[in-house]
A protein has these predicted regions:
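Bacterial carbohydrate/catabolite-sensing allosteric modules
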Residues: 1-165
Length: 165
């Protein structure tokens, strides 16, 4: 998501739920920092926003995003992103013309917003199935062949980002 946004933006915010969460907070923040570095963009703590995963928190964050001079955001939940989107609109900020948003759940919420949210599509069924198999092996004290599994994922371009050439 950051790599995509970095093609046309230098001030990319990271909007997340609690950063103490191992996966949703810590790991994603590390990925955000690494992607910024790879794109040649300096990390700024002032562009990291922590909240709850709620529409209301996203809406309230819009004003802080505007004040930060961010021009894009990676948001770690669709409901949170919908709040950001509507908060920006209510402050007169046009998405995607003035501000781009990419979210990460690909839930129905991302398709119901106007504009529709560009999102990272994740194979949630496969994620659950593989997790259950691994958990079952751990419970039966069986050896895990792999401790990390990378599942296919990709960007689903919708209308909260500008088209790239």
């Amino acid at each position: 998501a950051v790599t995509y946004l970095a093609k046309e933006n230098e001030r990319i915010a990271f909007v997340s739920g609690p950063l103490v969460d191992d996966i949703n907070g810590k790991v994603r923040l590390v990925g955000y920092k690494e992607a910024l570095k790879k794109a040649g963009i300096s990390y700024s703590e002032g562009l990291v926003f922590e909240s709850k995963y709620t529409y209301e928190d996203g809406y309230a964050l819009a004003e802080r995003l505007i004040s930060s001079n961010a021009t894009a955001a990676v948001v770690t939940g669709d409901e949170l992103a919908a709040g950001v989107l509507n908060g920006l609109a209510d402050h007169g900020v046009s998405v995607p013309e003035e501000f781009e948003i990419i979210t990460s759940d690909d839930s129905q919420v991302s398709r119901f917003t106007r504009p529709n949210l560009t999102t990272i599509a994740q194979p949630l069924y496969d994620l659950g199935a593989i997790s259950m198999r691994m958990l079952t092996k751990i419970m039966h004290k069986e050896e895990l062949e792999e401790r990390e599994v990378l599942l296919p994922h990709g960007l689903t371009e919708r209308r909260s980002t500008r088209k790239r050439k």
